[in-house]
Amino acid sequence: MLKMESTQQMVSSIINSSFEAAVVAATSTLELMGIQYDYNEVYTRVKSKFDLVMDDSGVKNNLMGKAATIDQALNGKFSSSIRNRNWMTDSKTDARLDEDVNKLRLLLSSKGIDQKMRVLNACFNVKRIPGKSSSVIRCTRLMKEKIERGEVEVDDAFVEEKMEVDTIDWKSRYEQLEKRFESLKQRVNEKYNNWVIKARKDNENMYSLQNVISQQQAHINELQIYNNKLERDLQSKIGSVISSIEWYLRSMELSDDIKSDIEQQLNSIDQINPVNAYDDFESILRNLISDYDRMFIMFKGLLQQSNYIYTYE
């Protein structure tokens, strides 16, 4: 036999099961869509939204209220359920109406239309006056019933706050805002002027650097021209030296083999690169000195074999 708050406990269990079903539906939908998710985050978000919608829409309180009425009837307190006799006549009709009302409440709550807005819309409506910009606010039957039941209160603190707002010294407020605006304007102008000065200095430094670079580039060009001229002069001088040596060589009474060997060495001199040309000249001079040294040794040996003595003068 059901006792005490068994119906309320079953309703609470059904609501909790609905929440778990909502979490499973959300996670399975994300998996089908191929979206990665954090289960704890989804659970927390769904719980927060579920609790908000169930509480704000009044569905939870509606279900728990009916369950409490049934529990009171089961516990022999039939008098407490008399106020619900209008909807207890047909349970099927009542179930369909409750389901539709709960769906509408959940839909409105999920769209951001909270309980305060729904109650105010149900208690008041606005009547437009033709030909005028003003309108008349009318109370509905629900508002009348709330007044009769003593469910309407006047917030004195709100009235006093409203009166204070109406007595604001707008002139002083405007002057304060004007001073703040002028101060802000001055700071902005100072920052702008400082930025302009800094930008001008940067431009001057940039132009100065460009001038220095231009001067250095001109100097580099001059050095390059001088270097090219010097290189051409050296190449010409090397060619002249080689020609002079070849002419002088032909005037000597040396054998043709010796002349040919020396000419080959002269022709091997690099006349394009002066550095290489100097190395080639050094090699030729070393060879000539070496040949002269061998000739002197041979001549010295002949003198000694002939019992002659040589001296340097």
UniProtKB/Swiss-Prot annotation:
<dbReference type="Pfam" id="PF01665">
    <property type="entry name" value="Rota_NSP3"/>
</dbReference>
<comment type="function">
    <text>Plays an important role in stimulating the translation of viral mRNAs. These mRNAs are capped but not polyadenylated, instead terminating in a conserved sequence 'GACC' at the 3' that is recognized by NSP3, which competes with host PABPC1 for EIF4G1 binding. The interaction between NSP3 and host EIF4G1 stabilizes the EIF4E-EIF4G1 interaction, thereby facilitating the initiation of capped mRNA translation.</text>
</comment>
<keyword id="KW-0945">Host-virus interaction</keyword>
<keyword id="KW-1035">Host cytoplasm</keyword>
<feature type="region of interest" description="Interaction with host EIF4G1">
    <location>
        <begin position="208"/>
        <end position="313"/>
    </location>
</feature>
<keyword id="KW-0810">Translation regulation</keyword>
<feature type="region of interest" description="RNA-binding">
    <location>
        <begin position="1"/>
        <end position="149"/>
    </location>
</feature>
<feature type="region of interest" description="Interaction with host ZC3H7B">
    <location>
        <begin position="170"/>
        <end position="234"/>
    </location>
</feature>
<comment type="similarity">
    <text>Belongs to the rotavirus NSP3 family.</text>
</comment>
<dbReference type="GO" id="GO:0006417">
    <property type="term" value="P:regulation of translation"/>
</dbReference>
<feature type="region of interest" description="Dimerization">
    <location>
        <begin position="150"/>
        <end position="206"/>
    </location>
</feature>
<dbReference type="GO" id="GO:0030430">
    <property type="term" value="C:host cell cytoplasm"/>
</dbReference>
<keyword id="KW-0175">Coiled coil</keyword>
<feature type="coiled-coil region">
    <location>
        <begin position="166"/>
        <end position="237"/>
    </location>
</feature>
<comment type="subunit">
    <text>Homodimer. Interacts (via the coiled-coil region) with host ZC3H7B (via LD motif). Interacts with host EIF4G1.</text>
</comment>
<protein>
    <recommendedName>
        <fullName>Non-structural protein 3</fullName>
    </recommendedName>
</protein>
<keyword id="KW-0694">RNA-binding</keyword>
<dbReference type="InterPro" id="IPR042519">
    <property type="entry name" value="NSP3_N_rotavirus"/>
</dbReference>
<dbReference type="InterPro" id="IPR036082">
    <property type="entry name" value="NSP3_sf"/>
</dbReference>
<dbReference type="GO" id="GO:0003723">
    <property type="term" value="F:RNA binding"/>
</dbReference>
<dbReference type="InterPro" id="IPR002873">
    <property type="entry name" value="Rotavirus_NSP3"/>
</dbReference>
